[in-house]
Amino acid sequence: MRNSSLRDASGSNDAQVPHKTELLNLPDHVLTEVAKRLATNNPVESAENIANFSKSHRFTRDAVRTEPLEKFSSRLKILSRNAKLLSHAVRHAATLPDGEQLSEAQLSQMRSEVATRPVLGVAYTHQDGQPEERLSGNHLDHKINNIPNLVFNVAEPIMFNEISALEVMAEVRPIARSIKTAHDDARAELMSADRPRSTRGL
């Protein structure tokens, strides 16, 4: 759901008012279910959708702050921030002492690995606030907590010219894969989360 999709085909917001009113009349647990469906397999889209939904009204903001959505957003912030850092590190690969040995195709593959496969680096720019330092929870949270260390361990040698440009790809690929897998697992967990009990009006 892009920003433009919040408007009708004529570009007018007026046609949306009745629909918005009907949406806000839904019970809390149904609003949360609606919000969950805004998390697509495209993390940039997910970040935009959830942010726009949250800004619509107090009820939609509360729906986004319920346990399944809030946890997903926290995970997305950490993953997207580190995908962005990994992407920055890869862009410096060509500046390494042996960087001239990298072909344009190899450089393109590196950039694609961190910027296209998980497009999370872009998603980071669509979120409010800083990511939590650490998540506390299940096995997936522990995996996500470890990703910043993995990114740092490859980014630092690149920044200080302590790694061969030809070795960067082998170091980056599993980290990029871990980030993408963690995002996919986080979304799957979100979609399978039980509905919260409605508390509005209590």
Swiss-Prot record:
<dbReference type="GO" id="GO:0042025">
    <property type="term" value="C:host cell nucleus"/>
</dbReference>
<protein>
    <recommendedName>
        <fullName>Virulence protein F</fullName>
    </recommendedName>
</protein>
<feature type="region of interest" description="Disordered">
    <location>
        <begin position="1"/>
        <end position="21"/>
    </location>
</feature>
<keyword id="KW-0843">Virulence</keyword>
<comment type="subunit">
    <text>Component of SCF(virF) E3 ubiquitin ligase complexes. Interacts with host VIP1 and SKP1A. Interacts with Arabidopsis thaliana ENAP1/VFP3 and VFP5 in the host cell nucleus.</text>
</comment>
<feature type="domain" description="F-box">
    <location>
        <begin position="20"/>
        <end position="42"/>
    </location>
</feature>
<keyword id="KW-0614">Plasmid</keyword>
<feature type="compositionally biased region" description="Polar residues">
    <location>
        <begin position="1"/>
        <end position="15"/>
    </location>
</feature>
<keyword id="KW-0192">Crown gall tumor</keyword>
<comment type="function">
    <text>In the host plant, component of SCF(virF) E3 ubiquitin ligase complexes, which mediate the ubiquitination and subsequent proteasomal degradation of target proteins such as the host VIP1, after its implication in T-DNA translocation to the host nucleus. Required for the formation of tumors of a wild-type size on certain plant species only.</text>
</comment>
<keyword id="KW-0833">Ubl conjugation pathway</keyword>
<keyword id="KW-1048">Host nucleus</keyword>
